[in-house]
Each structure stands twice: as C-alpha cells, then as structure tokens.
C-alpha cells in the first residue's frame, strides 16, 4: 500500500454555522448552482426490519470480517428524505454519537425547508432534525442532531486517513435500497486529503452514507460517482474534515 501524507491544519469553526435554523422560511442547506447533479426524486425501497441497537459502540481495534463490519454499524446508518416543498430527494446519513449527533453530505439537505426532512432509521421509525451544529458547502458535509430521546448505535470515527490500497466498505441507501453494503479499495487520495477516491460503487441515494475501514470505523462520507464513466470512479469526503466541528 502507498502511504500519503495528509498533514493539514483544520479550519477554524465559523461561529455563524453553529446555530440551528429557527423558522419555516429558513433552509437547512442554501441552494446554489455549484455544478453538482440534482439528487434523485424520493424513492421507496424495500421494507427494512432490523431494529436500532440501543447500546454504545465499544472500542475494537481488531480487523473485522465484512459481515462483522456490517453487523456492527448497519443500525447506525439511516435513510434521509428531504423536500424543497415542491420536489423530494433521498440520501443517507449516520450517527457519530450515542445521543443522536449525525452527519451527512451538505448537498443532501441543500435547499431543504425546515421541517421538510425525514430521518428514517433502519427499524422504520422516523424523526426530524432538531439542531444543525455545522454545515460546509465547500467540503460537502453537515453535522446535525436527530430528535431522538434514547441512545442509538453509532459509528466510531477513525483516528487517521486511510492509505491507498486499503480495503474499505460502504453502507447507504442507493436508489432507496436501505442499508446496502458494498466494498472496494482506496484508489487515490486527492485535494490535499479532502477527497478519497474509491472503487466501491456510489449511486444516487448513497450520498451521505458511511465509508468504513477494516476495523469498522468511519473514514469518510460517501458523496458521489461519475456516471457512465466505465471506470468505477467514486469518491467520499474525508471524515477528518468534520472533527473540529463535532459538538
């Protein structure tokens, strides 16, 4: 495997982004013409019967089998339905703490009116976003609180950026298919370690899902792919980008 240095000073959090949106005319993510393809219309996938695991995720430094990685983290990943009030979209997200703090892509919520979002857990229960801690259009992530009053399973964040050639796994809801599990490798690390190019497939609806290492830790937020390239070009945002902003 090729090691790539990723030393960079984290950005200073912007205090203006630490407050929740408080009125119906506000937006969880501000619309802009940034060249990203529009998200697909909201889609209904097959029913999901797995229940949320209401225990704290324990530290485990050993290499896990693919089945163990899925079993450890699947209930921490959820589907997101959003709407501008006129058009619906679908993406993914995942918990990063037991008290309901979660992360997804900024573009999943872009243009979404407050109250027009549904967080659908793997057990089928639906919740709303109660607070936005930070959002970054540039780095395409949003950290928020899901209005859930019990402990939830969550994904442990990895301490470091993975290396080129390392095995990775994804969990998300491509085309609305809840908790789809895929695997691949780190193909390249780009843009000063902000972008992880991966060979695991990322389709519409996978945006905001979790990218995992062989220990079952989050190393990225799955973000997109190049359609019809024939070269399996997919990418994720480095999870290290969110660390300065986690409450």
Range-by-range predicted roles:
Residues 3-5:
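C-terminal motif of bacterial Sec signal peptides marking the signal peptidase cleavage site
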Residues 83-90, 97-172, 176-180, 193-197:
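Conserved active-site neighborhood of the chymotrypsin/trypsin-like protease fold
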Residues 97, 105-110, 172, 182, ...:
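Short beta->alpha transition motifs characteristic of CBS
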Residues 137-140, 204-205, 230:
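Short acidic/glycine-enriched loop/turn segments that link adjacent beta-strands
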């Amino acid at each position: 495997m090729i090691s790539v240095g990723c030393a960079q000073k984290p950005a200073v959090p912007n205090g203006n982004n630490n407050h929740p949106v408080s009125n119906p005319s506000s937006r969880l993510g501000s619309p802009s013409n940034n060249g990203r393809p529009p998200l697909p219309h909201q889609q209904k996938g097959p029913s999901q019967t797995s229940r949320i695991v209401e225990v704290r995720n324990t530290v485990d430094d050993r290499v896990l089998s693919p089945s163990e990685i899925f079993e450890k983290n699947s209930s921490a990943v959820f589907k997101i339905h959003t709407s501008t009030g006129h058009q619906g979209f679908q993406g993914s997200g995942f918990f990063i703490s037991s008290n309901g703090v979660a992360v997804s892509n900024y573009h999943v919520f872009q243009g979404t009116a407050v109250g027009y979002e549904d967080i659908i857990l793997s057990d089928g229960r639906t919740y709303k976003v109660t607070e936005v801690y930070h959002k970054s259009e540039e780095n395409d992530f949003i950290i928020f609180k899901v209005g859930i009053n019990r402990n939830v399973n969550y994904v442990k964040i990895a301490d470091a950026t993975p290396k080129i050639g390392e095995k990775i796994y994804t969990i998300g809801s491509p085309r609305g298919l809840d908790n789809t599990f895929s695997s691949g490798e780190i193909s390249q690390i780009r843009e000063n370690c902000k972008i992880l190019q991966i060979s695991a497939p990322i389709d519409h609806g996978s945006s905001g899902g979790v990218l995992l290492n062989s220990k079952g830790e989050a190393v990225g937020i799955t973000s997109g792919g190049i359609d019809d390239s024939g070269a399996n070009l997919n990418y994720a945002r480095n999870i290290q980008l969110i660390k300065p902003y986690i409450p």
